[in-house]
Amino acid sequence: MKIARFTEGGTTRLGLVVAAGAATDTGEIIDVGSADPSLPTDVGVLLASGDLTRLGRTAGTAARLALSAVKLEAPIAQPPTFLAIGLNYADHVAESGMTKPAAPVVFNKQITCVIGPGDGVEIPTAAPDWVDYEGELGVVIGTRCRNVSVADAPSVVAGYMIVNDVSVRDWQRATPTMTMGKSWDTHGPTGPWLVTADEIADPHDLGIRTWVDGELRQDASTKQMITNCWELIAHLSTAFTLLPGTIIATGTPAGVGFAMDPPGCMKAGSTVRIEIDQLGVLENPVIAQP
């Protein structure tokens, strides 16, 4: 299933996306949220309830809406935790002038940074010069879990989506920890929907591409990860409990703006488009902070 959170007619609800391909302006959405008003209006809340089958009970009779007629929202508006991994592609390690880490580099993005498709990524007034994009595969946890083995890790995954780990590079590098450079409001675009795990045969063989204003900047595969999704889940859950709806952004490949010569960071007026095979497209305009 492709589970979307969307707004139409002044209300936000859940739906099932069909026949969309990679685009978010073609295809339809089955309006299960209207057909069953008892459904949660957030994918994270639905996952916490432990019953995804509720979505299918009214799918056969629910109305269908054109995707172009609705506003897609972040699938999980307030994840319990938004974790991210740094330096998880060797080519990005190299372009950053760093050495391969001995263990996964883990940091938090504050959940207030989450936005959805089409929402504006703000260039902060206080830090306008080094605002960068990072196209990433997002893994979403579906089951409360702790001490998960690598072998069992697939069983705790609800699905996948696209994440743009927007980064304010000068703030990121000002301190040993990255949270302040990674958590500005609007700097966590996610979407365009959650693709359930059963639809992705291998999350470690997906093409990932990022464009800025039509220029291809990142073109890689998730097979290039240093620490794969299952290993990351095992590592993280050794230390702390993972809750349903937790987002894990698994790192970005080479091609980020700060590493270009001259630098190619985002500016107000830019558009960033990220596409991951089988997951769709996440596109956001870049705007000045109001």
Give the positions of each predicted feature:
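Structural signature of FAD isoalloxazine-binding scaffolds in flavoprotein oxidoreductases
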Residues: 100-117, 131-133, 267-278
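Catalytic-pocket segment enriched in acidic/His residues
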Residues: 8-10, 63-65, 71, 92, ...
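N-terminal non-catalytic cap/leader segment that marks the start of a structured domain
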Residues: 1-104, 273
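N-terminal accessory regions of nucleic-acid-interacting proteins
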Residues: 146-160
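A structural-propensity feature for long, helix-poor, extended segments
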Residues: 116-138
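Short helix-loop capping/hinge motifs at secondary-structure junctions, enriched
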Residues: 145-148, 199-201
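Residues embedded in well-ordered beta-strands
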Residues: 14, 136-140, 161, 209
